[in-house]
Amino acid sequence: MKKYLIPTLLLAVFEAVAVSLWLGKGNIFYLLNFSYIGISLALGVFLFLRGVPQARRVSQLLVGTYMLGYLGILCRENMQLEGFWYYLFSGSFTAATIHYAVAKIFGPLVFGRGWCGYACWTAMVLDFLPYKTSPGPRKSFGWIRYIVFAASFLFVAALFLLGIQNKEAILFWAFLLGNSLYYAVGIFLSFRLHDNRAFCKYICPITVFLKPMSYFSLFRVKCDHSKCVSCGKCKKVCPMEVDVTDNSRRRKKRHGVHSVHGMREKLPQKGTVMQKSSTAQGQHGKDPLHAKAPSG
C-alpha cells in the first residue's frame, strides 16, 4: 500500500485547499472545483501505479476539458497567463490567481511539473500527435517563451494603463484566440520538428514560473544505479530529453512527471523511480518505471 502514498497525498493537498477556500470565502464552488481536480489527478496516478497504459491521459482529459471547456468557455474565466495578470492587478485572489498559485507557483514545490503531464489542456491535445520522442537535440530558441511571457504581462498592463473598458470581455476573447494560437503553433511545431512537446520546450510561457519552483520539488524522478544497466535507452525515449540517470537537481532539462509515463514501457530494467527527493533508496514494482514513495 505504500506505493499509493503519492496519489493519497496529492488528493489530501487538493482537499485541504478545497476546504480552506470554501470556508474562507464562503463559496461552495471552491470545494467542488478543487475536489474534482484533486480526484482526477489522484485517479490518474493511481491508475498508473496499477499499470494502466493510458492512465495519465485520463487525468489530462478530465482536468483539461473541465478547465478549458467549463471554466474557460462556459464560465468565461481566462485561465491563461493573461487572466492571472488581470486578477492580480485587480487585487482579486480568485479564479486564475488561485489556479496559478496552486498549480504553477507553489504546487510545483510538491509535485514538480505535474501540471504539464496531468492537467495542461494544451498538452492534452498535443499528446495525441504521433511524435512521442524528439529525433534530435533541443533547438536553441527556447528564449521565445520569455518573449511570450513578457508580451502577456504587457498586454494586460496596457489594458489598465490605457483605461480600457470591458476588460473581462476582452480577456475572454483573448482566451479563445490565445488558446487557438497555442494549438496552431503547437501542432505546427510538432509536425515541423517531429516532436509532440516542441511547444512545451520552446514556446510555453508557464515554464517561467514552473522551472525555479520545480527545482525544489518534494517528489522527483531518481535513478537507482544498482539496477541501471547504462543502456542509455531512457535518454533516447524520454519525451523531454532528460538525463534520467543523473540524480542531481542540476541535471539538464528538468522535467515534468509525464516523462516517466513516456518511458515506462520501453526500458529493460526497473531502475528509475519517483520518490521523495530526500532519499535515494530504490523502490521497485512490476513496471519498468513507476511512481512509488520511499519507505523512509
Predicted feature residues:
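Non-ligating segments of multi-cofactor redox enzymes
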Residues: 1-246, 255-258, 262-265, 270-295
